[in-house]
């Protein structure tokens, strides 16, 4: 019975975009996005420029590029639906725009998880903008 309850809880969709992305990050990395990724490297957080500093920063660069390709809605505001299944994220819903946003966030959260071994809080947290002057890679 307990297993069925856990499965039911894990399949509940979440609403509210920023909360959704934060929850994805926590589920995949066991770290809060706000404190672990908001001011990391040259791309994690609002904006972004220069060359990504490490694999985690590259996750944010790719996420920014992904948002740039979303059409017909605001990627930072539109709420979408998803579930956590078998340790992964599955985007749902019928709205193509919301699904694109979800896929961008899913890919970033999974990328953060896959690069935890190179995450360097001491070196890249609140990284100086003056160190992000190299030419950016193209999306």
From Swiss-Prot:
CDD domains per UniProt: PLA2c
Annotated binding of Ca(2+), by residue: 43, 45, 47, 64
SMART domains named in the record: PA2c
EC number annotated for this UniProt entry: 3.1.1.4
PROSITE patterns on file: PA2_ASP, PA2_HIS
Name listed for the protein in its UniProt record: Acidic phospholipase A2 H1E6
An annotated Gene Ontology molecular function: toxin activity
Chief place of localization: secreted
One annotated Gene Ontology cellular component of this protein: extracellular region
PANTHER family (UniProt xref): PHOSPHOLIPASE A2 FAMILY MEMBER (PTHR11716), PHOSPHOLIPASE A2, MEMBRANE ASSOCIATED (PTHR11716:SF9)
Organism: Calloselasma rhodostoma
Complex and partners: Homodimer.
């Amino acid at each position: 019975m307990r297993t069925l309850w856990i499965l039911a809880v894990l399949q509940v969709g979440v609403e509210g975009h920023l909360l959704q992305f934060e929850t994805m990050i926590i589920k995949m990395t066991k770290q809060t996005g706000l404190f672990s990724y908001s001011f990391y490297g040259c791309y994690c957080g609002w904006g972004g420029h220069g060359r990504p500093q490490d694999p985690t920063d590259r996750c944010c660069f790719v996420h920014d590029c992904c948002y740039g390709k979303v059409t017909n809605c605001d990627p930072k505001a539109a709420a979408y639906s998803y579930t956590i299944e078998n340790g992964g994220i599955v985007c749902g819903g019928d709205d193509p725009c919301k699904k694109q946003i979800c896929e961008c966030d899913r890919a970033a959260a999974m990328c953060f998880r896959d690069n935890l071994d190179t995450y360097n809080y001491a070196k890249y947290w609140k990284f100086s903008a003056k160190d992000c002057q190299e030419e950016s890679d193209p999306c």
